[in-house]
Amino acid sequence: MSSTVTTAHTAGTGSTVITNIAGLVTNSPSFGRGSPRSSKFESGGASPLGLIQDAAVVIDGDRVAWIGESSKAPATDNRVDAGGRAVIPGFVDSHSHLVFAGDRTQEFNARMSGRSYTAGGIRTTVAATRAASDADLEANLTRYLDEALRQGTTTFETKSGYGLTVEDEARALRIASAHTDEVTYLGAHIVPPDYADDPAAYVALVTGEMLDACAPHARWIDVFCEKGAFDGDQARAILTAGRAKGLHPRVHANQLSYGPGVQLAVELDAASADHCTHLTDADVDALASGRTVATLLPGAEFSTRAEWPNARRLLDAGATVALSTDCNPGSSFTSSVPFCIALAVRDMGMTPDEALWSATAGGAAALRREDIGHLTPGAYADLAFLDAPSHVHLAYRPGVPLVSEVWRRGRRVR
């Protein structure tokens, strides 16, 4: 079968062709089984990466117009030589917490030294974030976004959750929404100390006045459904209230223990259940039978020396898996999707193909997007060049800065 894709797009004035690509990862069903549109990686089947050797891609405006073999590339006004490098879709980081101030180095140092630490965890970041100016919060956010972009991330989701007052949660979302459309209201991160004796009153705030202030600035609503945070009934009330305001649900689920989070996520057709470390067979079956994506966050397990989620179990059951950084100052202070890919392959039972698909097409599925996460005609021209001939090097050479060039919306940005 010819690897050239015929499309309704033709190379137009101002279009660009990138040629001499050693291996182009398309995530296209035309080049393997599975696709970002089906949101399924078919475990045990042919790779869905749709890999084209000696490939070319044509970009017209902000979109992919053509993909295929270099020898069959149409003429364009501009030509870029990839120099025998691999090209992949830009990473889709579908879970991060980037609007915050301060850090928690003391907590990390104590944890790595085996000492107990009781200085506040999330509450430490809440205090620092509340005290920070808008300018400081935006400067921090753009710094971490630039870090991520340099490592190949072209789409990201980020959450509030370090304000926990009406004013501070709305402020965080306003700042985030200036940089991404994928903004999540996480007023239900923890119950703040001033509501410790009356968590029901805080749930009422999260589903009432705070929701009213935050909904205009967000696409998603999230809740930390876990012992010590919000139980299943509270999480249901929060997500249902958000959905009534037009926000789509996501759930921090089953990170620290078995619980109702995953089942609730599937029941409410949440786009994603995130963490998914402690799963029953019923949880796995529910994820495999529904649209909810299991978003795995290996940076958290790495940073906390916790039990790894079992990606192999989820994939073999037919669940859709995404990989994301969970970038936050407490439990996963990394903006590097390549690092998370290496961890997933080394410690979570994923193949290099599965891990890359999950960090691109899987992330797109977790955001219910069909215009990103793959390099096929009509998709956004978001892509990363690797200083390597194959995408496998992302897992094969952990810690090496392999991303050498990044394009977003058809323009080189790094």
Swiss-Prot record:
It is an enzyme of class 3 (hydrolase). InterPro entries: Amidohydro-rel, HutI, Metal-dep_hydrolase_composite, Metal_Hydrolase. Its cofactor is Zn(2+); Fe(3+). Pathway: Amino-acid degradation; L-histidine degradation into L-glutamate; N-formimidoyl-L-glutamate from L-histidine: step 3/3. Binds 1 zinc or iron ion per subunit. It is found in: Cytoplasm. 4-imidazolone-5-propanoate binds at residues 104, 162, 189, 255, 331. One of its GO terms (molecular function) is iron ion binding. Fe(3+) binds at residues 95, 97, 252, 326. It comes from the Bacteria. It catalyses: 4-imidazolone-5-propanoate + H2O = N-formimidoyl-L-glutamate. One of its GO terms (cellular component) is cytoplasm. CDD domains: Imidazolone-5PH. Zn(2+) binds at residues 95, 97, 252, 326. It holds the Pfam family Amidohydro_1. N-formimidoyl-L-glutamate binds at residues 162, 328, 330. Its EC number is 3.5.2.7. One of its GO terms (biological process) is L-histidine catabolic process to glutamate and formamide. Keywords: Cytoplasm, Histidine metabolism, Hydrolase, Iron, Metal-binding, Zinc. The keyword Thylakoid does not apply. NCBIfam families: hutI. Belongs to the metallo-dependent hydrolases superfamily. HutI family. Catalyzes the hydrolytic cleavage of the carbon-nitrogen bond in imidazolone-5-propanoate to yield N-formimidoyl-L-glutamate. It is the third step in the universal histidine degradation pathway. This is Imidazolonepropionase. It comes from Streptomyces avermitilis (strain ATCC 31267 / DSM 46492 / JCM 5070 / NBRC 14893 / NCIMB 12804 / NRRL 8165 / MA-4680). The lineage of its organism: Bacteria, Bacillati, Actinomycetota, Actinomycetes, Kitasatosporales.
